Amino acid sequence: MKKIFAMLMLIMLVCCGCGKKLDEVSTTTDLDNIMKRDVLLVGVKTDTYPFGYYDQKGSFSGYDAALARIIARGLLGSDKKVKFVPVTASDRMMKLYSGDVDMIVATMSITPKRQEILDFSTPYYTAGQAVLVRKGSSVKSLRDLNGKKAIIVFGSTSERSLRSAVPNVGIRGYKTYPEAYKALKIGRADAIVSDDTILLGLALKDDSVELLPKRYSKEPYAVAFRKGKESKELIRAVNNIIEIETHNGNLRKIQETYGIK
């Protein structure tokens, strides 16, 4: 995780350095580029049901994908003017700074560390850290993981909160949630620690695992952007869309569609 942040900081500094030289001849913003292209490029996950996944037809589905379509409609006049780019928790920031996407809508929570290299919209959902175990497990709370092994997904916020709450836990990291889930099932660790909404998606599909009831944090999900003045106009536009869709009840209806509380 530290290597990823160091690399992104370097990329950001290089971009900022180049930007200073171009200020006198270019005032192009990220929103200008989107409007000119007439397509919104959005990074979404495919392994985090019910937020981001492929449906039976192989199409991008979930709350995050639905929000991305709403943003495309608000910016470009049509929810079909969006191109989805699959991302994972470990590669989403790299894809943003490489220019593969204009924004990330992928269960990404706001943290002080991330705010050093990213700008965020206003939150569109609040999750909480939780624990998923095999049924019949002796683990009944986060603290029961002392002296045991827990699984996290690289790029998520789980490792930080887990080490703080359970100093003597052994941590196994995986790149994707399917890999983490498989590791739990075959007994490579005692639990997965992650956002409750993501873990609930796994538990709903398999009655051999269960989600423990307690939540250990608040994780505000927001749309993520490249840090810098080029993103400011785009962020304002997205914030306005989120505010409108929140007040008119559309975001709540989408949450209910996907069984999200």
Regions found by a protein language model. Name each.
Residues 69, 73, 81-144, 210, ...:
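Acidic, polar ligand-binding/catalytic clefts
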Residues 24-104:
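Extracytoplasmic small-molecule ligand-binding "clamshell" domains
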Residues 19-26, 35-36, 159-174, 207-215, ...:
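Ligand-binding clefts/hinges and TM-proximal coupling segments of bilobed small-molecule sensing domains
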Residues 19, 24-25, 65-66, 70-74, ...:
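Extended ligand-binding regions for polar small-molecule ligands
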Residues 27-29, 82-94, 137, 157, ...:
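Short helix-initiation/N-cap motifs at beta->coil->alpha
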Residues 91, 108-116, 161-164, 185-218:
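A ligand-binding cleft/hinge motif common to bilobed small-molecule-binding domains
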Residues 33-35, 133-150, 229:
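Flexible hinge/capping segments at coil-to-helix
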